[in-house]
Amino acid sequence: MLKTISPLISPTLLKVLAEMGHGDEIIFSDAHFPAHSLGPQVIRADGLSVSDLLRAIIPLFELDSYAPPLVMMAAVEGDTLDPNVEARYRDALSLEAPCPDIVRIDRYAFYERAQKAFAIVITGECAKYGNILLKKGVTP
């Protein structure tokens, strides 16, 4: 057993977080994201919300300080975003330091980034546009 590591972080996720290098990206996706068809390693975190997982990993994960470290999917034209989703993620990511800005990109650009990601974590999140990309930084 390891101490101070949240039980929400599976052994597989812990290994992936440790293997990632600076500049590598990981997606925490909602339950409807097409992770398996995009290519990178997929980790299942069924039943967990994205915000709970973000809260669990942020003490272990340094965000990139040289490039925008947080990216979310923009709403498709004619659709709307629930601002509470981003607010929950910001709150979770603010536990260790102020949350950096979150950049929004269109759905297909997000899918392209996901194809190049180190891994995709599929959660039980049901919020629309509930996907977020994190870019790993250099530890101080």
Swiss-Prot record:
The keyword Metal-binding does not apply. The active site is at H22 (proton donor). It catalyses: alpha-L-fucose = beta-L-fucose. Keywords: Carbohydrate metabolism, Cytoplasm, Fucose metabolism, Isomerase. GO terms for cellular component: cytoplasm. GO terms for molecular function: fucose binding; L-fucose mutarotase activity; racemase and epimerase activity, acting on carbohydrates and derivatives. Pathway: Carbohydrate metabolism; L-fucose metabolism. GO terms for biological process: fucose metabolic process; fucosylation; L-fucose metabolic process. The keyword Iron does not apply. Substrate binds at D30, R107, Y129, G130, N131. Its EC number is 5.1.3.29. It holds the Pfam family RbsD_FucU. HAMAP family: L_fucose_rotase. NCBIfam families: PRK15420.1 (NF011949). Involved in the anomeric conversion of L-fucose. Belongs to the RbsD / FucU family. FucU mutarotase subfamily. PANTHER family: FUCOSE MUTAROTASE. Homodecamer. This is L-fucose mutarotase. The gene is fucU.
